């Protein structure tokens, strides 16, 4: 009666009660119902009804086919189990005593009856599958001539060094020669006007003095130290003039030092900075004190600005070479392209000449590529020191471009990304307003250079000489006359750190590092002036030419 399992039925008992549910089991003795619902509203999971109590049965729903098949499988399994439990097992009637009297089974003798060699030989003869089509053939490593170690030119960009680096100078010279006739005509007009308006004797006239007081001092220093060649008759007169200029310089330094001491911001009162490695307190200097050090070095020790310039370039180049990877990367056998350094310079005998000398030491060995962009055209350079350093720089392999667009187009043809930008437009002896003057062309050019520099992101580091562009070297505050400024990540200090760095840290969030570079000022120079004696007892550059500062 298993075929009725799962049927929904309504059972009427002899006492008149009605019960609904699904048949879970049906036998001759009665029914077992699931999901039972009584006539009075009661419910139960299971309920058994004896056959003697049944009066009537009504089928409400029929069981599903899947339920029937499942029930049939269960019934078949039950039948098979019952058969296995029957009397049909052949070994259960064996006599155990007879089995014990039999000999032990000889595995070795029966194994010898099977000739494995002939069987496997026959299987191999009948096997027509190629070895490479088998599974083991697919997993086997292909035999090929392969070296254990890679060469230095493998797994790199092919011909990475073969780009348009050597073509930059030729394109630049063509554009320079094309603009030379027009520029010469403009220079002639400017010279004619200047000859009428400017006279060397008017050096003390306030009308012809530079805008800033720092440029006044620079102007006096060059007038005193860079005098033209003279004969014996006028030698005494020139010496007297030189003494007068130096006397005026001393008075100006004293007056400006007093004014700076009373006008410095509150955050600028700290006059020392700590070394990152030695934790030594290093005194900080004002721009006037740095100029005074150079003047004393030239006057008392006969070390001119060219010698100081060369010392700075050598020590700063060693520091930047370490930043670019050092000896592990800077090798001629390296198949990767050389790192690229971009210099933004001005026609300044300090910042511009320093940057060019530094670029020369970086590129003269062929390990580093250096491109320079001036705030003016190359044929408009006027400072003799900058012109001299430019010629040497070009002979040593440095490149010069005349515009930001030329710089960008040159970078697109090179396999070397820009890794370091050297900001040398301003320096500590002038401002961007002084560089631009009244020329809107130069001002626009400087702004485009600053904009390009600030767009360099990622691993590109921007190192400014002494002070970033757009900040005042005396106070470290943003220049109120020139709103654009460079977001430098590091500062290269010449000789001594400027006291303006204290305010610069708060006004320049991108600033991360600062390094002090030895320019070769003798220790005895600090004892010549009372204001410089605080620099005399510092052991900075004993074995190295650079020293990291803790900002």
From Swiss-Prot:
- PROSITE patterns documented for this protein: DFDF, SM, YJEF_N
Residue ranges of the YjeF N-terminal domain? 288-527
Region: Disordered, residue numbers: 64-92
- InterPro entries, alphabetically? DFDF, FDF_dom, Sm, YjeF_N_dom, YjeF_N_dom_sf
What are the residue boundaries of the DFDF domain, all occurrences included? Answer: 93-129
Record keyword Iron-sulfur present = no
GO biological process terms held by the UniProt record: cellular response to glucose starvation; deadenylation-independent decapping of nuclear-transcribed mRNA; P-body assembly; positive regulation of nuclear-transcribed mRNA catabolic process, deadenylation-dependent decay
Subunit info? Homodimer. Interacts with DCP2.
Tell me, in a sentence or two, what this protein's role is: Stimulates decapping of both stable and unstable mRNA during mRNA decay. Does not affect nonsense-mediated mRNA decay. Required for normal P-body assembly.
Tell me what else is known: Present with 2340 molecules/cell in log phase SD medium.
User: Per the similarity annotation, which family is this?
Assistant: Belongs to the EDC3 family.
Indicate what this protein is called per its UniProt record: Enhancer of mRNA-decapping protein 3
